[in-house]
Amino acid sequence: SIMVPYVGSHDVPRLTSRADTGTNDAFNQWAEDGLPGQPGDVSAYNAAMQAYGWLLTTPGAPLLYYGDEYGEYGGADPDNRHMYRNESSWSIMETQLFENISELGKLRSESIALQRGEYSTRLAMANLLVYNMTHEDQVMSVVLNRGAPTSVGGFESNDIVRFGESSMLDGTLSVEAHSVTVIELDADIVVAPIYGCTNSTATNFDASATEDDGSC
């Protein structure tokens, strides 16, 4: 059997509305009660990215309720069943969320560790969670940071950031605030060839060239 984890569904109010700290109408379901509107604060979308960052990097076959990929808002059933909105009506925050979830979903589809790896916690704090997804052919490390910028050590020179804006230097990851980061551990580093003349006796010899281009 395969687990099907999910964050949103037709049984609960939309996640961005539940995460919208500026209102208390997320569980309203009828117009006369006052229904949630589109969140105007980025914190709701940051929370959604944390949730779907977890969903797309942990075991199981992740399920996304339609519209959650861009952060559709809505209260309790039936207000959580809005028609899917065309991207031309999305806010900048909704567009950014969609792009990030799409990119992370693509990475999952290409990563055997994210699809079938075994979960193990590396670090767990109030606002920071670091865990590995380990498969015999690949290991991915995931950093979920719902707080301020921070840093996480213990990485190696050939560990590569595959998703997120955080950066790696000398084994230390500088973690952006409210971010999701995925690092491939012990990654195969592919160096692009530098074409040029590799004949040291030629007049156009290029000492930096790694592959001859036939111009000698």
Where are these regions (language model features)?
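Primarily marks secretory-pathway-exposed extracellular/lumenal segments that are disulfide-
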Residues: 189-216
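Active-site and adjacent substrate-binding regions of carbohydrate-active enzymes
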Residues: 1-193
